Amino acid sequence: MTTNRAFEIRSGYSHTLGANYDGEGVNFAIFSAHAERVELCLYDPSGEHEIARLELPEYTDEIWHGYVPKLQPGALYGYRVYGPYDPENGHRFNPNKLLIDPYARELVGDIQWNDAHFAYQLLHDDKDLTFDDQDSAPFTPKCRVIDPAEANWEDRQRPSIPWSNAIIYETHVKGFTQLNSAIPEPIRGTFEGMGHKASVDYIKSLGITSVELLPVHWFPDDQHLLDKGLKNFWGYNSLGFFAPATRYYGPKGIQGFRDMVRAFHDAGIEVILDVVYNHTAEGNELGPTLSFKGIDNFSYYRTMPDQHRYYINDTGTGNTVNTSHPRVLQMVMDSLRYWAESMYVDGFRFDLGTILGREPEGFDQRGGFFDAVTQDPVLAKLKLIGEPWDIGPGGYQVGGFPPGWGEWNDKYRDTVREYWKGDNVTNDFAARLLGSGDLYDLRGRRPWSSVNFITAHDGFTLNDLVSYNDKHNEANGEDNNDGHNDNRSCNYGAEGPTDDEGINAIREQQKRNFLTTLLFSHGTPMLLAGDEFGRSQMGNNNGYCQDSEISWVHWDNLPETANALREFTRHLIQLRATQPLLRRESWRDGLEIRWFNAGGGAQQSEQWDEGSTIGVCISRPDLQPEAGIWHDALLLFNPFEGSVPFRIPMWGEGGWVLELTTADNAQQGMRITEEMDFDLAGRSIVLFRRP
């Protein structure tokens, strides 16, 4: 038993990691397989003054632990960890650095970047092989003990939207709310603003079922961005896997996040979090020591097998989290369960998800992480979405995730963009339209496994996709060298905004084509926030550092074309939601598909290799007769500039009624009762149904 001033520390227990309040005191437990001792540092409410330093008295199963009686929620703390400073063997212990608890449920303060954050002498020629003795505590956030009783979800139920009914809306807490005048100014840019009635009602009015939020785990602003007057806007640089990003706090603090989830659930909308477990904000061997690196670098990160000083960089960020280590895997699983059970979210999208399936020999869809999730009684019921790639060997794994997972399908994105540019991808386009069975009709996976998208946070918005040939990222301060160059975009005659009515008309029609393709494709559609009314980032396709009006959604003074596009999008979503044949549930659900060419005959094998107009008849004869439910639909696609006479076949009985067109010149409600040539406008889609 060790005492320090007014504090006493007892043995405590090792089975629950983090700082856990039991009503009488707080148990502290932290994993480190290679540390020699660990000190718990307690701070006054300001976080500026250390009031006690207590050595954790016990070491059990590689867990350092101790119990502080009478300590209450709200207490601030950090760790100092002692051990070898031996970078060449993968160890970077430095007790001069105050470290953030990997299990901290809340952090107080921001990182005030200082040379003291680095475990080595920055100006020394030997760099990270040197040792720095400056104290980083004055410049480092403090961890806060929370009261678990505040997370009360009794008598609450999740919306539990079936995958086949889901429509995902990707957005950003601050970006979505900062400029919305319908939200009270004090809570704009916060969780409370995201959960405000104005936000929830708008998303509900579109017909969205599931909101996917860009990262909300705690993350810092990188020094190099601050030096340029920029910030880490997207948040893909996590450090606290259990702690919400305090930059999104409103007056209610952490409770604002829970209230946001409740508000969406009350509206029948799911909340999905974009999570970043593949790397941390500590960078490579020359990065700062903030948490994992100083606690047990060799365990938490994957190092080069023959040079442990250096990190495997399959993420492109400098380090890679070592989820093949059982304790690191446990941390990720504990984090997921915390957000699922204590914060009550409904699913996760895993950034660079291939990393999580990497074992020492490479990616394995039966690897430890996937097995752990599959058998977990809580997580296996949630929506799990992988970004199925990283930059390491064999990192591209689209179609390679295990059953139960959805995947961002970039083949869908690229093919659809190419098709509407007029490229020769008809065969691939057909496969993407019908759920990418070539990728997902395996091991009992369903069409919903393909998360289809045209745009996402990373890349052009929909408006910019049809307005710019090239990226314009000058505001990022990297001489326009950042961001993707291969955008498969087209400006149709002018770069950026123009007064040319003809060009603007084409752009609006192409937006309708993209949205119609997305929402009538089998699979799970994901819409980028603001695309429904033509939000622009002025050609910036990499807004990761733009916490500014470049990335924020603009709500006021929208042109009539924006309002018209929004209403068109609502109509598309309503059609998808009400018509089962537009949202396939299974590869074996009785759906009948007939592809035909502009002459009305069956699409021939040689025609699949040509860029061409195409038609498809989708039938569900297995559906029970019900008023308003379609059993048959015709979709016609023309990606080319000129109109095409398209022979409408008369399969079945009753003829056809024109339900929807993306062109301005076709007649809504037009009825066809006999085989005839229909003038399919250039760059358009037409949907027919039975009367």
Q: What annotation goes with each model-predicted range?
A:
Residues 86-90, 177-179, 219-223, 279-282, ...:
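Short catalytic/ligand-binding loop motif for oxyanion handling, primarily in non-cytosolic enzymes
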Residues 136, 172-345, 352-378, 420-421, ...:
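Substrate-binding/active-site clefts of carbohydrate-active enzymes
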Residues 1-169, 174, 503-508, 512, ...:
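Carbohydrate-interacting/catalytic domains
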Residues 30, 79, 171, 203, ...:
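Conserved, mostly hydrophobic/aromatic
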Residues 32-34, 58-60, 70-72, 83, ...:
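Short, flexible loop/turn elements at secondary-structure junctions
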Residues 167-169, 211, 271-273, 348, ...:
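Hydrophobic faces of well-ordered beta-strands that scaffold small-molecule active sites
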Residues 344, 359, 365-529, 533-534, ...:
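Conserved alpha/beta catalytic core and glycan-binding cleft of carbohydrate-active enzymes
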